[in-house]
Amino acid sequence: MLKKCIPLILLAISVHPSRGAEIRAVLAHPIFNVGYACTEHGADSSTWDLGDRFGIDCYVEKQVEVDGRSWERPYSGSGNRNEDWYAWQREVLSPCTCKVLDVSINLELNQPGRMGTKPASIFKLKREDGVIFHVVHFEKPLVKLGDAVVAGQVIARVGNSGLSQHPHIHVGAYQGSEPLQIRFDQHYIQPMEATKSK
């Protein structure tokens, strides 16, 4: 008698001590004044620092039409040049009304598709309630240490420095030793731009 073989698949699951617990969120002003998309960092995605856990990587997308078809994408052409990316050199807006707690600048520019090395250019911005935001991978800062900024104020331009493979802005937040999930205030979200390609 033949027995049916059932393949056994084993999955390695990383157990996180707070998995299942509700993650506190913080409301932030959108980081761009045009339509954009973000990818999120999970609880186990980084152990570098509190500004990385639950952080998000945001980039500008455009509605692209080619030969009667349309979709959203973050770059034109091959994407091999920083200038191909729609986020490149866009204005970066402050996520909060806060004070500039720290500024670090990395002038080394990455090429898309090639990971750079730490550190990236970073702002640390502190709200009155103690929430600290990290805004990372920018260039051409417009504010300095100790400046007071308001939510939505232009603070820099999008760059591509540090541990980054393409032009984008990373935003992270924490209060004390607790990382926070970021939610952008949708009252200020702008529509996506459109472009036509040949």
Where are these regions (language model features)?
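Sec-dependent signal peptide recognition
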Residues: 2-8
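Short histidine-centered loop motifs in beta-beta connectors
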Residues: 86, 93, 131-152
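Active-site loop architecture of trypsin-fold serine endopeptidases
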Residues: 112, 158-170
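Active-site-proximal beta-strands of protease catalytic cores
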Residues: 98, 147-162
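Surface-exposed, glycine-biased beta-strand/turn segments
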Residues: 18-119
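A residue-level detector for short acidic-glycine micro-motifs
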Residues: 102, 137-140, 157-160
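Hydrophobic h-region of N-terminal signal peptides that target proteins for export
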Residues: 8-18
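Acidic, glycine-rich catalytic/binding loops that coordinate metals and/or anionic ligands
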Residues: 21-32, 36-52, 119, 140-154, ...
